[in-house]
Amino acid sequence: MKMLVFPVLAALFAVGLGNLVGAPRDINISEAQDALDFAVAKHNSGTNDMFLRQVAEVVRVQRQVVSGNKYIITVKMAKTPCRKDRVVNEVCEIHKDPALAQPYECTFSVWSRPWIPDLQLVGEKC
């Protein structure tokens, strides 16, 4: 009987833990807004398009604890009518017409170390 109880209890304990320690966990976008803003700015500076892209929809936001925080953010991006070389404090809304907006999905990975005021874009897949 004892030999049967231990494996059953161990299995129940493992199922109850859910996510592994150190695995990415879903979080609210408000916890990763700075990381998302940073990633979008880097994305825009790295494209050859003359128009800015903005976030049309947040699909998923996760945080993984890795010598700081790694934010894994999946968003739908779309084109705005604002030119990159003319934007100062202009509000740039996404084109309403999907043919002009040309939406696409990106996953950004941003590494943050709160004790150092430094963000790094460590992954971008669009």
Curated annotation (Swiss-Prot):
Leader peptide range in chain numbering: 1-18
Biophysicochemical property: temperature dependence: Stable between 20-40 degrees Celsius.
Major site of localization recorded for this protein: secreted
Domain of life, per lineage: Eukaryota
Site entry (Reactive site), positions: G22
pH dependence comment: Optimum pH is 5-6 and pH 6-8 for papain and bovine cathepsin B, respectively.
GO MF, one example: cysteine-type endopeptidase inhibitor activity
Subcellular locations according to the entry: Secreted
Coiled-coil zones: none
A cellular component annotation (GO) from this entry: vesicle
Keyword list, A-Z: Disulfide bond, Protease inhibitor, Secreted, Signal, Thiol protease inhibitor
Motif stretch (Secondary area of contact): 64-68
Domain (Cystatin) ranges: 22-115
Intrachain S-S bonds: C82-C92, C106-C126
Reported tissue expression: Ubiquitously expressed in normal tissues including brain, eye, gill, heart, gullet, liver, spleen, stomach, pyloric ceca, intestine, kidney and muscle. Expressed, but not up-regulated, in lipopolysaccharide (LPS)-stimulated tissues including kidney, spleen, muscle and gill.
Similarity-based family: Belongs to the cystatin family.
Function: Thiol protease inhibitor. Has high papain inhibitory activity and inhibits to a lesser extent fish cathepsins L, S, K, F, X and bovine cathepsin B in vitro.
Protein name per its UniProtKB record: Cystatin-C
Species the sequence originates in: Paralichthys olivaceus
Organism lineage string: Eukaryota, Metazoa, Chordata, Craniata, Vertebrata
